[in-house]
């Protein structure tokens, strides 16, 4: 990789990692540091998503440092970190994807089935679901820990790069293209890409239809049947719900854009047996897109959620005043529950 190409990649990966790490740390602090916000089921899921995204960004750093800085796939770190990093990277990636699916199902129940929401989406049920999800992804990703190790390769030991960094090995899969590994990768493709994409798209489409088409309150905004107070509340609900829909669409769009290209390459090579040799720069770009998904969620919260922007100002400027505030939580269904609760949505 030439210097002209390498420098932009270095800057891009560094900026992406820094922005993603700082953004997710702020989300974690904003929720975990506020007792009122921790009472919201939705915020528990957002906290879980931020933890998974933050850890995923951290454990992908050993993956992109060698190719971005040195133009190779050499492993720079102790050998035992190869299977550990690869395993944890996949665990947190799978947890991030599955948490997004849990979030969309929770939103569907809260919006489309509000009468069942209190029972189905209780704090206890959500915590159990999150725990089961982490156990599942930890078990599912275990082949990465078992079948990855550092492979020594022949290198020119007289080169300056070898003398400085001892670049002579790669962290790679030890079973190659065995049938069972291809079957595992196909299962991974279905479980953590195709099925989540299908469920998220279908569920959020139904949520959007419910918000835009089926709620008579949204269509009553300008009618004379509402008094001024009710009209104002309806207008506020309309604006809130529009922002929710925009955020849901943005999440789905980012998910597709970030993961579709690299999954198409995998499907073509592993399943359809199509011979593809994309340029190495293209592979780096695909990995950068995958990282972008983990880094973008805090930006989406800031862009679409007024409550998150308000909480962000509290964290950055007046953290001591947050606990003294009594907040009102407005549910997504235009039903207000007065009390010490807060949510980003």
UniProtKB/Swiss-Prot annotation:
Disulfide bond as UniProt keyword: yes
Segments traversing the membrane: 12-32, 41-61, 91-111, 126-146, 188-208, 247-267, 282-304
GO terms (BP aspect): G protein-coupled receptor signaling pathway
Record-level GO cellular component terms: plasma membrane
Record key words, sorted: Cell membrane, Disulfide bond, G-protein coupled receptor, Membrane, Receptor, Transducer, Transmembrane, Transmembrane helix
Compartments, record wording: Cell membrane
PROSITE patterns: G_PROTEIN_RECEP_F1_1, G_PROTEIN_RECEP_F1_2
Gene3D superfamilies the record matches: Rhodopsin 7-helix transmembrane proteins
InterPro entries (alphabetical): GPCR_Rhodpsn (IPR000276), GPCR_Rhodpsn_7TM (IPR017452)
Cytoplasmic membrane side: 33-40, 112-125, 209-246, 305-345
Keyword RNA-binding: no
Tissue and organ expression note: Expressed in pharyngeal muscle and AWC, ASG, ASE, ASI, and ASJ sensory neurons. Expressed in ASI neuron. Expressed in AFD neurons and in AVK interneuron.
Mutant phenotype after disruption: Increases the likelihood of dauer diapause in L2 larval stage animals. Reduces the level of daf-7 secreted in the ASI neurons but has no effect on daf-28 secretion. Does not rescue the absence of dauer diapause in daf-3 mutant background. Exhibits broad pathogen resistance with longer lifespan when feeding on live pathogenic bacteria. Shows both reduced avoidance and reduced learned avoidance of pathogenic bacteria. Does not affect pharyngeal pumping rate and defecation cycle of young adults.
Record family assignment: Belongs to the G-protein coupled receptor 1 family.
Name of the protein in its database record: Neuropeptide receptor 15
Originating organism: Caenorhabditis elegans
UniProt lineage: Eukaryota, Metazoa, Ecdysozoa, Nematoda, Chromadorea
């Amino acid at each position: 990789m030439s210097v002209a190409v390498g420098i932009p990649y270095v800057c891009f990966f560094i900026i992406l990692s820094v922005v993603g790490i700082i953004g997710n740390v702020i989300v974690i602090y904003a929720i975990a540091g506020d007792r009122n916000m921790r009472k919201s089921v939705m915020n528990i899921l957002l906290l879980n998503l931020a933890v998974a995204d933050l850890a995923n960004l951290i454990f992908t750093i050993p993956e992109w440092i060698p190719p971005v800085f040195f133009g190779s796939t050499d492993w720079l770190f102790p050998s035992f970190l190869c299977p550990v990093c690869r395993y944890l990277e996949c665990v947190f990636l799978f947890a991030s994807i599955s948490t997004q699916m849990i979030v969309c199902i929770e939103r569907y129940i809260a919006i489309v089935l509000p009468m069942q929401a209190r029972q189905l989406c209780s704090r206890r049920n959500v915590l159990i679901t999150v725990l089961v999800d982490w156990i599942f992804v930890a078990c599912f990703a275990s082949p990465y820990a078992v079948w990855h190790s550092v492979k020594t390769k022949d290198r020119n030991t007289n080169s300056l790069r070898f003398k400085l960094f001892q670049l002579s090995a790669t962290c790679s899969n030890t079973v190659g293209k065995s049938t069972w590994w291809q079957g595992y990768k196909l299962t991974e493709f279905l479980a953590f890409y195709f099925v989540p994409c299908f469920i998220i798209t279908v569920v959020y489409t139904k949520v959007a239809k419910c918000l835009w088409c089926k709620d008579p309150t949204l269509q009553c905004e300008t009618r004379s049947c509402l008094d001024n107070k009710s009209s104002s509340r309806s207008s506020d609900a309309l604006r809130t719900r529009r922002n929710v829909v925009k955020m849901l669409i943005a999440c789905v769009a980012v998910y597709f854009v970030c993961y579709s290209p690299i999954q198409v390459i995998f499907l073509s090579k592993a399943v359809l047996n199509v011979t593809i040799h994309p340029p190495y720069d293209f592979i780096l770009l695909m990995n950068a897109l995958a990282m972008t998904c983990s880094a973008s969620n805090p930006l989406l919260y800031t862009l679409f959620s007024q409550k998150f922007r308000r909480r962000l100002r509290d964290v950055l400027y007046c953290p001591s005043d947050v606990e003294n505030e009594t907040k009102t939580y407005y549910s997504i269904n235009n039903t207000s529950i007065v009390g010490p609760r807060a949510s980003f949505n």
